[in-house]
Design a protein with these regions (language model features):
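A beta-rich soluble binding module of mature secreted/lumenal proteins
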Residues: 2-5, 12, 16, 22-212
Length: 212
């Protein structure tokens, strides 16, 4: 089996995981009522332009491809059609592993204050993505899902204060997550492994010029 998370087989597994969640949600709505957890509350109105750019993944309840991610960075940029280009960059299994990337596309759900997105890894399936927390200074965010299957604590810097981390974990637990499933993502910068470079912002071109 190919162990490179950039391999199409890995990307397909990630897409299928979200597709299975989407199908389960559809089944519960279309058939007999199923016991469901409460919808994740949002962070309120989100300034989408300010939210764009690079986010270091501090901790997560991981999807299958990112279960051993190191130096994980999620980058966002607004497309001309209003959707959100996403670049998830990480190294699988160690700081010296090759860089792997995934490129889902986000769509903001109307009427959610820009706080709920649908992430598409594989057409036509879309996965719920809720901005559940956003610090007033815009430096930390907590992404959750109503199924409580995956979550991401992200920050504008590779490390955050212990108190901020504990507060985020308390919030995640209050939302109904099992903290035993949380994995702290190793972050070490600057990089020294293959393809060592600062993560290019999703809204920058190859020369570093911001795309308009």
């Amino acid at each position: 089996m190919d162990q490179n998370p950039s391999h199409p087989r890995w990307r397909l597994r990630a897409a299928l995981a979200f597709a299975a969640a989407a199908l389960a949600a559809c089944a519960s709505r279309g058939g007999a009522p199923a016991a469901r957890l409460p919808t994740i509350p949002t962070a309120g109105q989100v300034d989408l332009a300010r939210f764009m750019g690079d986010w270091y993944v501090i901790a997560h309840v991981p999807t299958w491809p990112e279960r051993a991610a190191f130096n994980a960075v999620e980058s966002y940029s607004l497309r001309e059609d209003g959707r959100i280009a996403t670049r998830f960059r990480f190294r699988h299994g160690g700081f010296d592993a090759p860089v792997s990337t995934m490129h889902p596309v986000g769509t903001v759900r109307p009427g959610t204050g820009n706080a709920v997105w649908d992430m598409q890894f594989l057409w036509p399936f879309q996965a719920e993505y809720v901005i559940a927390e956003l610090s007033p200074d815009g430096q930390r965010t907590l992404i959750a899902r109503s199924d409580r299957d995956y979550a991401w604590l992200m920050a504008r810097t590779p490390q955050i204060a212990p108190q901020a981390y504990e507060q985020a974990m308390a919030r995640l637990q209050a939302l109904g997550y099992d903290l035993q499933k949380v994995r702290r993502v190793p972050q070490r910068w600057p990089e020294s492994g293959p393809d060592a470079a600062p993560p290019q912002r999703a809204n920058e071109g190859p020369t570093g010029e911001v795309a308009r």
